[in-house]
Amino acid sequence: MGTVNVVRVASLHKLSWYEKFYFYSIGKGLWITLKHFIKAAILRRTVTIEYPEKKRKYSTRFRGMHTMKRDEQGRERCTSCFCCMWICPADAIYIEAGEVVPEIQHLHPEDKYAKKFEIDLLRCIFCGMCEEACPKGAIYLDGPGEMATDNREDLILTKERMMQIVGGPIIGERQ
């Protein structure tokens, strides 16, 4: 066996005396803190929102609570293809599929439907991957942002609750 030649690629940056003692970093952090203090205390710009009297304004890209869409005839869009369940990194979605029988054919456009559809908001990380994976455009994260509750069962969304979050059935695409 021969010897291996090692070549040093990166050279180490020589720290100056003030970088060694972190005076520069401490001063930089104190300057940021001082700027925020001046804005809040002297200029009287408030940072805190008086919740629940005042509501926060959300951007158009805000990911709120999950909602399920219906098509133009008012039928459920979800065909229980399990795409959202498989792609969910937090494993927060549970779907149980059912076969469409003639009695409920008018409610579902396909042969299969979601008999049980649950999202556990305690596990959900609101990444939006379920929304992107849905081929039918059935699930969206455009619901309300306030989800505070004192009951853990309220944080498990069922299909029925997702369809009535914004005051009744939701028809059409995202605005």
UniProtKB/Swiss-Prot annotation:
Residues annotated to bind [4Fe-4S] cluster 2: C88, C124, C127, C130
Compartments it resides in: Cell inner membrane
GO cellular component annotations of the record: plasma membrane
Keyword Secreted: no
Catalysed reaction, written as an equation: a quinone + NADH + 5 H(+)(in) = a quinol + NAD(+) + 4 H(+)(out)
Predominant cellular place of this UniProt entry's protein: membrane
Cofactor: [4Fe-4S] cluster
An MF annotation (GO) of this entry: 4 iron, 4 sulfur cluster binding
Family annotation (PROSITE patterns): 4FE4S_FER_1, 4FE4S_FER_2
Residues noted as binding [4Fe-4S] cluster 1 in the record, renumbered to the chain: C78, C81, C84, C134
Alphabetical GO biological process terms: aerobic respiration
Family statement: Belongs to the complex I 23 kDa subunit family.
Role summary: NDH-1 shuttles electrons from NADH, via FMN and iron-sulfur (Fe-S) centers, to quinones in the respiratory chain. The immediate electron acceptor for the enzyme in this species is believed to be ubiquinone. Couples the redox reaction to proton translocation (for every two electrons transferred, four hydrogen ions are translocated across the cytoplasmic membrane), and thus conserves the redox energy in a proton gradient.
Record note on quaternary structure: NDH-1 is composed of 14 different subunits. Subunits NuoA, H, J, K, L, M, N constitute the membrane sector of the complex.
Entry-linked PANTHER family: NADH DEHYDROGENASE [UBIQUINONE] IRON-SULFUR PROTEIN 8, MITOCHONDRIAL, NADH DEHYDROGENASE UBIQUINONE IRON-SULFUR PROTEIN 8, MITOCHONDRIAL
Protein name, per record: NADH-quinone oxidoreductase subunit I
Organism in which the protein naturally occurs: Leptospira borgpetersenii serovar Hardjo-bovis (strain L550)
